[in-house]
Amino acid sequence: MANKKAKKKPTIRTIRAYDIEDSDEGYRVLVDRLWPRGVKKETLQLDEWAKDLAPSSELRKWFGHDPEKWEVFQERYKDELKELKEARRELLDNAGDQTILMIYAAKDGEHNHTVVLEDFLKQG
């Protein structure tokens, strides 16, 4: 019988696109559908742009980064992510053992989709 190794949970950091520095190491993945305004490609030095893992345009527009809609947004986004298990696996495979550096543009670091996405990526 083959001995299956338990997969360890990935190490994930989130960082705003406007705050990233050359010294920020890891598998750099932009997790927004839209490119961050005013940011040059060279600045982010991306390994991947995972548009599919970002909230749908409809959900993003509905949410509008309104903290009062946060609870409902989380549930709706989790429902969208349930359909994206293949995209999740691809990202984790691509990152390998590297720390995943999730890059986003939102101003609010507490009420944005990367909070939900991080949990989704860490689930077994």
Predicted segments, located by residue:
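Residues lining hydrophobic/aromatic ligand-binding pockets adjacent to catalytic sites
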Residues: 2-124
